[in-house]
Amino acid sequence: MKRIFLISVMFVLFMTSSIVKAQESNVTTQAQDESKLKISGELLTDDRILLKDKNNWAWNENRIALRLDKKITSSSKFYSEVWLRNIGLPNITSSGDLYNKGIVDPYNLEIREAYVQLFGFLTKNLDIKIGRQRITWGTADKLNPTDNLNPYDLEDILDFGRHRGSDAISLNYYFNNDFSFQSVFIPFSQPANMPVGIFANALNPTMELPQGMILKGYSDIILLPKYNLGESTVAGGKFKGMVKGVDFSLSYVWGRDGLPFGTRNTFVPVDTLGGININSQLSFARTHIIGADLATSIAGIGFWAEAALFIPEKDVIMTNDFSAFYPMSPVPVTKDSLLLDSSKPYIKFVVGGDYNFADGSYINLQFMHGFIHERGNENLNDYFFLRYEKKFFNDKLKIAPVGGGFIVTDWNKIKDNYAIVYMPEVSYKATDNAEITLSTVFFDGKGDNLFVNMKDYDMFMFKLKYSF
């Protein structure tokens, strides 16, 4: 009997030991898998051709996006994203350019993100992220008025909402599963990079000259903030929470407008027929931004709303200097115009929703007051964006017959102040990681606004995206 008991005890101990070893082995294997360097990315080919005139090429981009993600320990990780691109068309103007491969075959390398994240830093509820990072704020779809920490990447004007990463320190403190607070410090602000190619002048304001003057030449200089804590720093904080299925946040940013203002124009006569040259000084205004957003779902319908109050720290004044026309005047001859009044904050906001139907179709609708480049209450326009798409053949084929926007710049004279953007699209998933997209975009309207200025750029677009 004792022998049977001892054998039973030994068997139980052996089985328990085996189970523990198996569990330890599984944990070790899982930990090893999590600590492995994860490499992912995509290859993107993006070509566009104009539909008018001689069908000139409008865009040519071949991009490899490479992402590295490694969890070094259970309390830290490294992440980076790098773009290697062949972008644009050769701009060869002389035989000397043929000796420069960067001109014959233009390419660039861009570090989009590169940071280290530490979990449980100093206290178990605090995470810190240091390095170049994309800090995304806001609940709206791509167009977020509260997303103001990172500079806009406006290179492709049709890629709404794209930003560059910033060198920053970001801390997240988690009160519990529902509430957290984020603080961000960016030591030096960066301006937005402007559109390129045929879109280069899309955001440039229309220049109104005094009667009788003809512009012969234009030049400008940029006055960047000094690189010190007082001038170049950007900082912000955001309280985020969830209450009864509603995600919300309140935020504040002490930053700079990423698009410059023309603060001084010097007019110089060049002939007796009214021809002039203009030299402009451009600078970046300091701005306080108070934001709020929310998102929820009701009966399967997604809703979101987002708003930002922009408060200029000082009046933004443009000075036109006509002293060159009056060489005998003992004092400068200037005229000032108020571009932004610090006592009159302005609000940009977005409201929208989306819904997935049982038949595989999807609809997305947004209304936005104030686009990226618009500043001041009297300059904010209204934008309606709509997209409807439907999937077929187990989601391999996606057709979006309705897509685009309707823009109103003056409701009192809407017939002469509107724009229409129509962008139908068809995409096909050839494999699980390869998608081909064909689309066209048409612009029309009257007046003076961003999309009316692109009326001559109706285009056909081809994209191939291969993910790995």
What are these regions (language model features)?
Residues L66-K70, E113-L118, I169-Y173, G237-G241, ...:
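Residues on the lipid-exposed face of transmembrane beta-strands in outer-membrane beta-barrel proteins
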Residues M454-F468:
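Outer-membrane beta-barrel "beta-signal"
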Residues D69-N201, K244, G445:
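Outer membrane beta-barrel
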Residues N26-K52, S76-S80, I399:
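Transmembrane beta-strand segments of Gram-negative outer membrane beta-barrel proteins
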Residues N125, D159-I363, F367-G376:
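Signature for the C-terminal beta-barrel architecture of outer-membrane proteins
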Residues T45-L51, L84-G88, R132-T136, F185-S189, ...:
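Transmembrane beta-strands of outer-membrane beta-barrel pores
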Residues L37, S74-F78, K124-I128, D178-F181, ...:
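Repeated loop/turn-to-beta-strand initiation elements of outer-membrane beta-barrel proteins
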